[in-house]
């Protein structure tokens, strides 16, 4: 008799995705982040669901309802901080996952890569709207500043902003719709993640060497299930250390002050995971130019497969490209730091140089380095 997991219509899908899936024998821990992102999404959805049971999306009571969750609801403080810091862990895993894809040439799986880029946009939109919900000072002013950027779009800009706001400023209507969108988007993210996996399993995983691994495959279970469990335990350890020892480490103190439209905070800045894009936005004096640069800083990921000029897939055997890749990582860390600094000398010029370097590396230097490496190989 055939095993039920291989015949049952539903079990068969799970079996072919997580149990009998043929996987390369040499994939490193950099391949753990896909499963970690899945765990992050589950944690965020569950904690978010429980928070939504006690949250009220009204400007008069939103801030109080979050306070009520932390003070009066059983383990409400734990759920709230798991959700807030879970978002940070989500983005750490996202950045490492994308970085892995860049380094090892995984972007040559076009459908998987482009759905991944779409997923990144969707998660960023979800996180932005979630940050508005506690209705603190940074929530309100962050929402005002970021939504206002759409007014830079020629002709329809101001109408578009008022349409999103549901009025002439960020107010009750804005908060209510942001809560609705913040609730529905994670389910869209989950569906997209399913499609992401579907396309990945059409080709099979890439591996560190970038070479075909068809001749050397091993079953996903037990090898990679055990390996993924180790990653999950490490993720939960870091998350719990954050939540239980320093839950406000990555937050902004201004968000413990209720939103006040009459009082602007001295430094308006988003959560740490948006700071690199915020720095790029601020480094261009023109409003429309800044918005375009902001969108392009993420959208550039979609162009990376077109810029692949190397004869090798992975960077494993390409020292020059490796060097440029790590310069790009350092540049992104610099941009993240600059995004959190006030707009004054010397931060302005550092931000502008780092922004120019970011686009130059991706669009010009890395493709040129690949061409140069091709010539070194005498192919």
UniProtKB/Swiss-Prot annotation:
Residues binding a ubiquinone: 201
UniProt GO molecular function: metal ion binding; ubiquinol-cytochrome-c reductase activity
Residues annotated to bind heme b b562: 83, 182
SUPFAM superfamilies xrefs: a domain/subunit of cytochrome bc1 complex (Ubiquinol-cytochrome c reductase), Transmembrane di-heme cytochromes
UniProt KW keywords: Electron transport, Heme, Iron, Membrane, Metal-binding, Mitochondrion, Mitochondrion inner membrane, Respiratory chain, Transmembrane, Transmembrane helix, Transport, Ubiquinone
Residues reported in the UniProt entry to bind heme b b566: 97, 196
Any one GO CC term of the record: mitochondrial inner membrane
Coiled-coil regions listed in the entry: none
Membrane topology value: Multi-pass membrane protein
UniProt keyword annotation of Ligase present: no
Chain's role: Component of the ubiquinol-cytochrome c reductase complex (complex III or cytochrome b-c1 complex) that is part of the mitochondrial respiratory chain. The b-c1 complex mediates electron transfer from ubiquinol to cytochrome c. Contributes to the generation of a proton gradient across the mitochondrial membrane that is then used for ATP synthesis.
Family membership noted in the UniProt record: Belongs to the cytochrome b family.
Description of how the protein assembles with itself and partners: The cytochrome bc1 complex contains 11 subunits: 3 respiratory subunits (MT-CYB, CYC1 and UQCRFS1), 2 core proteins (UQCRC1 and UQCRC2) and 6 low-molecular weight proteins (UQCRH/QCR6, UQCRB/QCR7, UQCRQ/QCR8, UQCR10/QCR9, UQCR11/QCR10 and a cleavage product of UQCRFS1). This cytochrome bc1 complex then forms a dimer.
Protein name (database record): Cytochrome b
Organism: Anourosorex squamipes
């Amino acid at each position: 008799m055939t095993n039920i997991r291989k015949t049952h219509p539903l079990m068969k899908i799970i079996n072919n995705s997580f149990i009998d899936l043929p996987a390369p024998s040499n994939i490193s821990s950099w391949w753990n982040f896909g499963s970690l992102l899945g765990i992050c999404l589950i944690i965020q959805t569950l904690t978010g669901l429980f928070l939504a049971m006690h949250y009220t999306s009204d400007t008069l009571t939103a801030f109080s309802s979050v306070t009520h969750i932390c003070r009066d609801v059983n383990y409400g403080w734990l759920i709230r901080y798991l959700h807030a810091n879970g978002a940070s862990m989500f983005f750490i895993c996202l950045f490492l996952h994308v970085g892995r894809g860049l380094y090892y040439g995984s972007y040559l799986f076009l459908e998987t890569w482009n759905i991944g880029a779409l997923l990144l946009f969707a998660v960023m939109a979800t996180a932005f709207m979630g940050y508005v919900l506690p209705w603190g000072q940074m929530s309100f002013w962050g929402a005002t500043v970021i939504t206002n950027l759409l007014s830079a779009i020629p002709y329809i800009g101001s109408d578009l902003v008022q349409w999103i706001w549901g009025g002439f400023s960020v107010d009750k209507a804005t908060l209510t719709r942001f809560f609705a969108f913040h609730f529905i988007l994670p389910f869209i993210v989950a569906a997209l993640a399913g499609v992401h996996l579907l396309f990945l399993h059409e080709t099979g995983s890439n591996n560190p060497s970038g070479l075909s691994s068809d001749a050397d495959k091993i079953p996903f279970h037990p090898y990679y299930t055990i390996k993924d469990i180790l990653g999950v335990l490490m993720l939960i350890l870091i998350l719990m250390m954050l939540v239980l020892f320093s839950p406000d480490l990555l937050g902004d103190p201004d968000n413990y002050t209720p939103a006040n439209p009459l009082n602007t905070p001295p430094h308006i800045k988003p959560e740490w995971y948006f700071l690199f894009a915020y720095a790029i936005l601020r480094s261009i004096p023109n409003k429309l130019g800044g918005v375009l640069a902001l969108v392009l800083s993420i959208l550039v990921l979609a162009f990376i497969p077109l810029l692949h000029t190397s004869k090798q897939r992975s960077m494993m055997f390409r020292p020059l490209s490796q060097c440029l890749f790590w310069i790009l990582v350092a540049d992104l860390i610099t941009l993240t730091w600059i995004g959190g600094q006030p707009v004054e000398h010397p931060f302005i010029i550092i931000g502008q140089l780092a922004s120019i370097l970011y686009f130059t590396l991706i669009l010009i230097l890395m493709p040129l380095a690949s061409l140069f490496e091709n010539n070194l190989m005498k192919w």
